């Protein structure tokens, strides 16, 4: 039986307020505190209907569950710690006994807080005094158990008393009367804690409670429970692990390689195995040591692991249906063979064999029935020992009687204890009734005191109200007189204010008329001054606007000029590409003529009669060189013109930027003058601040206007002789076209003259041709000639006529000397280098 509860107050209140705990038995207890001779009697109501359903009944399932939840006891194999008791259902009893022996634990169950209603109870106790109840002394031997039992009974008392108060006054707070009284008495009498006061135990009741046997029984059960937990009995319902079983396991195909390693180990005998199995005390310890000392790497053989790994790899590679079908067939055959070798199936499946066995068994049974049995009516207990039922009953009675005697003794003790508890409960009930009557009397006195106090306060309030009304009436009369005086003064003040308002309105109307007249005159004067200032401003701004328009026109002309220059540059780029293509073409022709010249020289050594044909080839080579020189001259001239145009474009861009800057400057000046004009208008001045303008611009506005007029006149005079860059570009294109026509004519005349002279000099030696090549114009000279002609066409010089060019070639051919082959080769190489060389700097100087 549980005598103590360790649940907190909130859980206990919720538990006892439930519907199942409202009908518990009522038990009254008396708790005495020896402090200043002021004992305290409390009412306790037991409501443990869940734990005890009747006299001598066992704990219910709900009570057992709550006890397990309370103490953390769960019947689960996963929990390895012990609860300290033999059976979970007696955990509450064991906990109560332990709490009785442990003084520190007892203090943990006591209420050490002050109830919220302690203040009210203390105030009431001051009037009526504390309760006068005879002290009840508790024996020292039963002081702990008495406190534990009282504590257990007080749990139900709280719930029952609280439910009763709820039924009487639903709006009252949840605090109980017992708690309030106890807290009030402690607060009023300055009660100390129980551990600080020495309690003198005295005998209570007729017979003291002897719990020695109960405690000894609980200790024995707890020891038995701990032993079962530390040394559990292993339940083995299968095959014993004996030598025969080891041999049977060793014979299997899978574990054979593992047990080969244990051939040298001595196998235990069946007797030793039985002894080992019988020693259950060291089972858990051996299992723990085995787990601690287990090496996972030494469980299996390395060769067996390799073989199993190879087997798994082989099985993973078998994916063919034929292989699987063959495997199934082999497995079926093996199963059939196993079924055929099953002795039990063959034995009990043979009908003839079974019939013969039944007949033999019947004959043996009939023969044994005819024989006399010596041990008839006895029980075979094994080992050839037969006992009669009387002997068995005698042995059982001798073994059970001591236990039953102890049980009967404990039952008698428990009954005596229950009787003692009942007597004590009756005594406490009587004491409680007396205390309740006394407390009722005290409450009646308190209520009477409250009624008297209320009547006294009512009389005092009536007298105070009459005094206040009298004072208020006097105050109202005095205030009415003051209000009348204030009203008279207010009327006089209103009359004075009306007179002042009339005078002020007349003055205000006169001031408005005067202000309107002055405002009209001022507006006319300001309009006239504003018109004059605007005229002056327009006169000052006019030069800036004209200058701005002029700069815009100049900017547009420069933009057009730049566009024309860009178009001319693009055209010259295309012309340069065309000339470069012609030069590469002529270079290819020169290479082909050089190859023909080399072959012609070889043929010239063999055939003297073909001199005329070879001479014509040399003449063609000269013409090609002349054309190449012409194209290079045109290319150089166009590159020079391109450079000039680029320079002009850069100059044009700079001029454009300068004009743009000038425009920004003119705009800023105009904005500045406009701002100064607006400032002057805002101030009401007729003219702008000339000193400020001179400080900012460097001159006055009048001087600035005169200077702008002079600049406009000078710009008009300069526009007449000025020619645009586009017209210059067109004149230059015409000059280049004229020069190109002159060069083509000179080339044609030169070619015809060379052919004529070649026919005339047919009979002369071939060395004259080499001399002509040596004396022919080089690349630099060929470039110089067209550049000179170009310069003359532009006013620098004139082109050489065709007659002079032909005479020059003919003189070269006629004056040619006989040269050796080595000299001819050197002259040819020199001519090639000159033709393929870069133009000389002097040529570019003449061009630029």
Swiss-Prot record:
It holds the Pfam family Eisosome1. Keywords: Cell membrane, Membrane. InterPro entries: Eisosome1. One of its GO terms (cellular component) is plasma membrane. Its main location: cytoplasm. It is found in: Cytoplasmic granule; Cell membrane. The keyword Mitochondrion does not apply. It is a peripheral membrane protein. This is Eisosome protein 1.
